[in-house]
């Protein structure tokens, strides 16, 4: 029976990538092709001696096999044995990084599957962040979220890998929540998922993200808002360059500001209605003495006039908006 290794799926140029210099390439070629060639020669020698007896052929074959094994380089004692080639953990990590950068997830998965499962080899592999990150990437793209969570929760990653791993952590939980609810998640749903499944400290440095803009940025946004509460995309891009924000952040700030101003206008309208003629009469009914209970027509009509004028100005987009009444310290 002929045993075919999983690494037979890969071509020789893939198994000898650019990270190996000429010296290491010769070593790897000697340990693979050179060794097999030497063994084949010994076997042929044993076969030619078959006329002298079966024992001679067997001895020749054994000698050939021994000759092939003696070609292993002595400096590779720290390497672990793969089915056909000797790779150090650093070289395996380099292969994983290359495949991850190129986006060849299918080939990356096959390569990881072909790695040895011996306890000593696994321990050496798990010390390399690139290999662990590659396992997490494959688990995410194959939908094996349980393995993804296990890798991310039980291994400490450096800050350079946090962004990508955090995105996979959140997206995996989003997909599970969508599958459970049977519908796409909205912003509020995603917020609840993030609260329910916070980032593990292995991929998060504990620093809270702040959405508070600097005073200069908020001042500039307010000035533009007073000029035009509904900026077009070109103005958003221009304002984004001036403030250092993204066009999306600028659009969100204007949207939130308009919502706050509408809420403030509605609150003011209710207050004006409460102090109108009916409100004054309701205060006078219990017998409380009031001065000037007879209201002049101009005074009685003033709240209505102010509300209507405010409505007209809001419709035309030229209302004089308050800068401090509905402004907040933190804007998203």
UniProtKB/Swiss-Prot annotation:
Taxonomy, superkingdom: Eukaryota
Pfam families the UniProt entry points to: Homeodomain, SIX1_SD
Chain residue ranges for the region called Bind to RHO promoter: 232-234
Quaternary structure and interacting proteins, as annotated: Interacts with EYA4; translocates EYA4 from the cytoplasm to the nucleus and promotes activation of their target genes. Interacts with MTA1 and HDAC2; represses its own transcription. Interacts with MTA1; facilitates the binding of SIX3 to the core DNA motif of SIX3 promoter. Interacts with EYA1; promotes EYA1 translocation to the nucleus. Interacts with TLE1 and TLE5 (via Q domain); can act in combination with either TLE1 and/or TLE5 leading to transcriptional repression or activation, respectively.
Region feature Disordered, mapped onto this chain: 232-251, 258-332
Keyword DNA-binding listed: yes
Keywords, ordered alphabetically: Developmental protein, Disease variant, DNA-binding, Holoprosencephaly, Homeobox, Nucleus, Repressor, Transcription, Transcription regulation
Protein name: Homeobox protein SIX3
Residue ranges, compositional bias (Low complexity): 293-309
Predominant place of localization: nucleus
One GO MF term: RNA polymerase II cis-regulatory region sequence-specific DNA binding
Biological function: Transcriptional regulator which can act as both a transcriptional repressor and activator by binding a ATTA homeodomain core recognition sequence on these target genes. During forebrain development represses WNT1 expression allowing zona limitans intrathalamica formation and thereby ensuring proper anterio-posterior patterning of the diencephalon and formation of the rostral diencephalon. Acts as a direct upstream activator of SHH expression in the rostral diencephalon ventral midline and that in turn SHH maintains its expression.
Species whose genome carries this gene: Homo sapiens (Human)
Disease link: Holoprosencephaly 2: A structural anomaly of the brain, in which the developing forebrain fails to correctly separate into right and left hemispheres. Holoprosencephaly is genetically heterogeneous and associated with several distinct facies and phenotypic variability.
């Amino acid at each position: 029976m002929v045993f075919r290794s999983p690494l037979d799926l890969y071509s020789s140029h893939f198994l000898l990538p650019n990270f190996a210099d000429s010296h290491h390439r010769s070593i790897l070629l000697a340990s693979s092709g050179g060794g097999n060639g030497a063994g084949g020669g010994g076997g042929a020698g044993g076969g030619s001696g078959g006329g002298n007896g079966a024992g001679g052929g067997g001895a020749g074959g054994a000698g050939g096999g021994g000759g092939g094994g003696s070609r292993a380089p002595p400096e590779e004692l720290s390497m672990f044995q793969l089915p056909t080639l000797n790779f150090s953990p650093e070289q395996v990590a380099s292969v994983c990084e290359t495949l991850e950068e190129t986006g060849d997830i299918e080939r990356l998965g096959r390569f990881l599957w072909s790695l040895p499962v011996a306890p000593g080899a696994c321990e050496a592999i798990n010390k390399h962040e690139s290999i662990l990150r590659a396992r997490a990437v494959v688990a995410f793209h194959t939908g094996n979220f349980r393995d993804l969570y296990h890798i991310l929760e039980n291994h400490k990653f450096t800050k350079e890998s946090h962004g990508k791993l955090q995105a996979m952590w959140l997206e995996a939980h989003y997909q599970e929540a969508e599958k459970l609810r049977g519908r796409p998640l909205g912003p509020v749903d995603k917020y609840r998922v993030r609260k329910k499944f916070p980032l593990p400290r292995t991929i998060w440095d504990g620093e809270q993200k702040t959405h508070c803009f600097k005073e200069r940025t908020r001042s500039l946004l307010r000035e533009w808002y007073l000029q035009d509460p509904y900026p077009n995309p070109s103005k958003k891009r221009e304002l984004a360059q001036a403030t250092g924000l993204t066009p999306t952040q600028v659009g969100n700030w204007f949207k939130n500001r308009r919502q706050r101003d509408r809420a403030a206008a509605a609150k003011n309208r209710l207050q004006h209605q409460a102090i109108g003629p009916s409100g004054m009469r309701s205060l006078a009914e219990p017998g409380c003495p009031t001065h000037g209970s007879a209201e002049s027509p101009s005074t009685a009509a003033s709240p209505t006039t102010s509300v209507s004028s405010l409505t007209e100005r809001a419709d035309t987009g030229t209302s004089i908006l308050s800068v401090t009444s509905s402004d907040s310290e933190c804007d998203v």
